[in-house]
């Protein structure tokens, strides 16, 4: 459960560190806006942070910037090989600029947000494996 013991729904930004995730590696180095909407989104990580393949982090460690109270302000982790992603924020709810609570004025003409890359990367990975 979230540390707040309630359902959290908010728009905030994530940092995408260097990573080997099939879906998120091409977004490394970005800060992107995204929706959070869950009551049970807390990552409880008993080991030290270096033991996990962290692929997305909330920009802040404390509430409300880390709305669920996840250890190490983790928003997403991945398997060592990069194939399996576990992510609490909803990137599928931030694909189009009109879905975002805030989007840069100079990018308002975009048809899609950078989050679409995650799904394009997954599709390309599957297509490559099907050859």
Question: Where do the model's predicted regions map?
Answer:
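Amide-donor transfer/coupling interface in amidating biosynthetic enzymes
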Residues: 1-131
């Amino acid at each position: 459960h979230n540390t707040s013991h309630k359902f959290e729904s908010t728009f905030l930004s994530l940092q995408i560190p260097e990573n080997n995730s099939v879906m998120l590696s091409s977004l490394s180095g970005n800060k992107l806006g995204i929706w959070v909407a869950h009551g049970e989104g807390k990552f409880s990580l008993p080991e030290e942070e270096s033991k996990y393949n962290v692929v997305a982090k909330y920009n802040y460690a404390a509430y409300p910037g880390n709305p669920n109270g996840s250890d190490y302000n983790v928003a997403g982790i991945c398997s060592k090989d990069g194939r399996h992603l576990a992510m609490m924020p909803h990137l599928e709810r931030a694909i189009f600029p009109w879905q975002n609570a805030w989007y840069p004025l100079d990018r308002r003409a975009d048809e899609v947000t950078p989050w679409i890359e995650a799904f394009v990367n997954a599709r390309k990975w599957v297509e490559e494996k099907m050859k």
